[in-house]
From Swiss-Prot:
Pfam families: Ribosomal_S5, Ribosomal_S5_C. One of its GO terms (molecular function) is structural constituent of ribosome. Residues 53-116 form the S5 DRBM domain. The lineage of its organism: Bacteria, Bacillati, Actinomycetota, Actinomycetes, Micrococcales. The gene is rpsE. This is Small ribosomal subunit protein uS5. Residues 1-50 are annotated as: Disordered.
Length: 225
């Protein structure tokens, strides 16, 4: 039987420990890189899905329910979602956490999509919408005017793809009422082509003349450039 000295045993144990540590380190780095790849792919997927629609969180409200053991908090989120090209919807989500409430609001908004009639980058005619005590007036504007509106109204119009419009809030300043009043106004818009067919008129007799002139002047300037 061959006896090994204490120094030889310690050298062998040190070698085994270093090999085990190298193996565990390599496995840990592999797991870390795999998690990193998974996280990167997940982030890329989220960014591509967000790129298809515009999402605006108008309001987040915290609600406290008093129970025997204390208070339970929950959150509600009012979210506007649209493609920026004539389609928009509004949703309301409730949950115990803010991100979950926002995601529920987004899903609810996508179920309530509707199409907004437009002429170039504005609305075809003046319109007024009401919801509870909220009243919102919208007027068409010439190209280049921009969205002249407050926060809740602006969120709805930008998601709907209306880039030139004048607005005025005449009633309640509550953001929920203002958003739904804006939606009511957009739902009362009529497509100029269908109105022209119904009245037996030409399309350009239905659209406001100043909007037609502004659109034609913008088109002529772009052709010249």
């Amino acid at each position: 039987m061959v006896r090994q000295s204490g120094s030889e045993l310690s050298d062998q144990s040190d070698t085994d420990i270093s090999a085990d540590s190298d193996t565990s380190a390599s496995e840990g780095s592999a797991r870390h890189s795999a998690r990193g790849r998974h996280r990167d792919s997940r982030q890329k997927g989220d960014s591509s899905s967000r790129g298809q629609f515009l999402e605006r969180v108008v309001r987040i409200n915290r609600v406290a329910k008093v129970v025997k053991g204390g208070r339970k908090f929950s959150f509600s989120a009012l979210v506007v979602v649209g493609d920026g090209d004539g389609t928009v919807g509004v949703g309301y989500g409730k949950a115990r956490e803010v991100p979950l409430a926002i995601s529920k609001g987004i899903e609810s908004a996508r179920k309530n999509f509707f199409t907004v009639p437009r002429v170039a980058s504005t609305i075809p005619h003046p319109v007024q919408g009401e919801a509870a005590s909220g009243v919102v007036l919208l007027r068409p504007a010439a190209p280049g005017t921009g969205v002249i509106a407050g926060g809740p109204v602006r969120a709805v119009l930008e998601c709907a793809g209306v880039r030139d419009v004048l607005s005025k809030s005449l009633g309640s300043s509550n953001s929920i009422n203002v958003v739904y009043a804006t939606l009511d106004a957009l739902k009362h818009l009529e497509d100029p082509a269908s109105v022209a067919r119904r009245r037996g008129l030409d399309y350009y007799h239905v659209v406001p003349k100043r909007i037609v002139r502004a659109v034609n002047s913008v088109g002529a300037s772009s052709d010249t450039a």
